[in-house]
């Protein structure tokens, strides 16, 4: 991605391209931004782990922790293994994310709602199901010097430690569509920030295989008492998200030939009450800090806690 197109309403409220600017400051780096599929990025990490560990370290999937204990009597002993974690291996069926019943033309579309903050935390249900499923009766007991919890905003590790995320949500819900678009919008294959007069905003990111990702502002939420504003996700479907995008991008037309994936989430800004327990168990990423996605620094900051911790942990 070399440029960003900025679209705003003119003095008559009609959507126009107001400017086109470099995606990054010219000359700041010999690198430029690119869009890569998450699977490709994970493959780079997996290959590097295998290479530099000489095949001794691998990433296991379909594994869920069921208990975490810290022996506080030995946390000051540098040679001790004070952390005990029980791991249970899930069956293939249990490990498969639950999808909503939404379908397009009779085909169920993969969605990311199972990890969205609009969905309830189902970790306890997964643990219970794993304990009852005979196919998933393999249990590991792991003794560790250190532990890094990078398990997202619903972090099981954070809850086991008794830490909380402090802050609040905004009143906005954002939907995400990965589509092969049908549109007369001229900059659909460019990175765009589109702001309408009254209907919200859309961010456009071109992807591989003719796909385009749209981040679409949906609506506000209701606040009940002193609680954070929360959303009822039952009404959120791909059609609702698409209709919001169509209103924002009018008078340009938008539909799609293929819907590849979708999700929705409520944006907020929170930070954990603590980042570590006894300097033995550490939290990283969304497990300990969540941000409004509209800030570019979010994408750079989220991995930094892990990057900073990893070199230190491998040396002890």
Where does each model-flagged region fall?
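Conserved FAD-binding catalytic core of PHBH/FMO-like flavoproteins
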Residues: 47, 51, 57, 120-133, ...
């Amino acid at each position: 991605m070399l440029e960003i197109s900025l679209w705003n309403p003119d003095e008559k409220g009609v959507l126009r391209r107001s400017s086109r600017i470099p995606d990054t400051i010219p000359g700041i780096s010999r690198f430029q931004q690119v869009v890569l599929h998450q699977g490709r990025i994970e493959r780079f990490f997996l290959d590097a782990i295998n290479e530099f560990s000489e095949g001794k370290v691998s990433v296991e999937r379909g594994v869920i922790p069921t208990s975490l204990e810290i022996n506080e009597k030995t946390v000051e002993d540098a040679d001790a293994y004070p952390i005990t974690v029980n791991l249970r291996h899930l069956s293939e069926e249990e490990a498969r994310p639950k999808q909503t019943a939404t379908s397009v033309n009779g085909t169920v579309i993969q969605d990311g709602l199972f990890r969205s903050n609009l969905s309830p935390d189902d970790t306890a249900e997964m643990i219970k199901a794993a304990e009852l499923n005979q196919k998933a009766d393999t249990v590991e007991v792991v003794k560790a010097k250190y532990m890094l919890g990078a398990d997202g905003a619903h972090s099981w590790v954070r809850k086991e430690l008794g830490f909380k995320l402090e802050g609040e949500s905004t009143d906005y819900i954002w939907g995400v569509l990965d589509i092969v678009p049908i549109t007369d919008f001229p900059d659909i294959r460019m990175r765009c920030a589109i702001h309408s007069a009254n209907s919200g905003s859309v961010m456009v990111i071109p992807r591989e295989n003719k796909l385009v990702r749209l981040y679409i502002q949906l609506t506000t939420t209701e606040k009940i008492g002193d609680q954070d504003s929360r959303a009822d996700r039952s009404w959120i479907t791909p059609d609702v998200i698409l209709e919001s995008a169509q209103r924002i991008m009018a008078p340009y037309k938008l539909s799609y030939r293929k819907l590849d994936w979708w999700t929705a989430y409520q944006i907020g800004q929170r930070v954990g009450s603590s980042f570590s327990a006894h300097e033995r168990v550490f939290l990283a990423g969304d497990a300990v800090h969540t941000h409004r996605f509209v800030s570019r620094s979010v994408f750079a900051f989220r991995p930094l806690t892990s990057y900073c911790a990893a070199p230190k942990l491998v040396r002890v």
